Design a protein with these regions (language model features):
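Conserved AMP-binding loop of ANL adenylate-forming enzymes
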Residues: 57-99
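Short, solvent-exposed polar/charged micro-motifs at secondary-structure junctions
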Residues: 2-3, 80-82, 180-183
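Short active-site-adjacent helix-start/loop capping segments
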Residues: 10, 80-82, 129
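Generic beta-strand structural signal
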Residues: 28-30, 38-40, 69-72, 91, ...
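Active-site glycine/GP-rich loop and adjacent strand/helix microenvironment
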Residues: 91-317
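Gly/Ser/Thr-rich beta-alpha loop segments that engage phosphate groups in nucleotides
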Residues: 36-39, 78, 176
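Nucleotide 5′-phosphate-binding alpha/beta core
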Residues: 1-31, 37-69, 114-121, 135, ...
């Protein structure tokens, strides 16, 4: 594999349609988080999507959660106008990560406490923000297991979340590109590779990964800039272990109602002609959006960004 050339994010962005091995109607489009300022659209076939779910099923079962048990999802599935949604088929309570503010603290507490979940998932910053609000209100929850992903889980976040939720956190690391998947060790001493998911080459300035599960959009020797701190392998433990993951610290947008909006890649969903972007906030009621446009950038792209912002943040917020 190392004899093949490295594929960069810019290369994928320019040649995504040429990389597809099947018609677009047979794949699902996904957008990366754009933590480097350059969001990317990639494609996944249904087989790879089901395989990722199978990996999640096995991993979570190992940590003490079985699919079908009561589960709370505190991620970006719901917008600003929808606080909660229960899906009875999967026994999942979805809560909006865009409405975590002092005014809604009691609602989140009551909803989770009444539901009595076995596990909860969420962005580290979302769970941490809720934990702070619960602490300020003198409230605590009882949730045996918590799963975090999409951002770097910082030590102070882990401590506060585990304290207020009376839980044990297991962190997961993956990419929308489906090129790598790591699970935290049961004893919390580093991260292990998901067997058969990808071939990974760890460098000082990132990693190069080859996906083994997405045949419809093959990512071969794809370069990521997320830096891994490695643990030394020994005869007793020859398996590759990642000690710490850098590069996933997420910024957030402060709203007037006190909520914090994270993973701001949603701003560029459906926007096709932006090379790079930067968001700058100096006051709670002001957001400056800078873009490096492609030649075909037009008003429809600008209006789409404005629509996406209002949809997630809310009018006047």
């Amino acid at each position: 594999v190392k004899k093949l050339p490295v594929v960069t994010k810019d290369m994928v962005k320019q040649h995504a349609n040429e990389m597809l091995t099947v018609p677009k109607r047979k794949v699902r489009k996904g957008n990366t988080s754009g933590t480097t300022g350059t969001p990317l659209s990639v494609y996944s076939d249904w087989k790879s999507i089901w395989m990722v779910q199978a990996y999640l099923y096995c991993t979570r079962k190992r940590y003490g959660f079985t699919y079908g048990q009561r589960f709370v999802s505190l991620r970006g599935h719901l917008d600003k106008n929808n606080l909660s949604l229960k899906i009875h088929l999967s026994n999942t309570l979805f809560l909006s990560s865009y409405n975590i503010n002092p005014a809604n603290t009691q609602f989140y507490y009551d909803s989770i406490r009444k539901f009595k979940p076995r596990a909860i998932e969420g962005y580290p910053s979302s769970l941490y923000t809720l934990a702070l609000l619960l602490s300020d209100a003198g409230l605590k929850l009882e949730i045996p297991v918590a799963f975090t992903s999409s951002e770097t889980l910082l030590p102070y976040q882990r401590e506060k979340i585990e304290q207020q939720f009376n839980t044990q956190i297991f962190d997961l690391y993956g990419m929308t590109e489906r090129t790598i998947s790591l699970m935290e060790a049961y004893n919390h001493q580093g991260y292990y590779e998901m067997p058969g998911f990808s071939i990974n080459e760890y460098l000082e300035d990132g990693e190069i990964c080859t996906s083994l599960i997405n045949e419809s959009f093959p990512m071969i020797r794809y370069k990521s800039n997320d830096v891994m701190e490695m643990m030394e392998t020994t005869e007793d433990n020859p398996q590759i272990v990642v000690k710490h993951i850098e590069g996933r610290k997420a910024d957030y947008l402060c709203c007037k109602d006190g909520s914090h909006i994270i993973l701001l890649d949603f701003l560029f969903k459906g926007v096709k002609h932006v090379k790079m972007s930067q968001l700058v906030q100096t006051k709670d009621d002001t957001l400056e959006i800078y873009v490096v446009p492609e030649p075909d950038f037009e008003d429809v792209d600008k209006h789409q960004i404005e629509y996406n912002l209002m949809d997630r943040v809310g009018t006047g917020n």
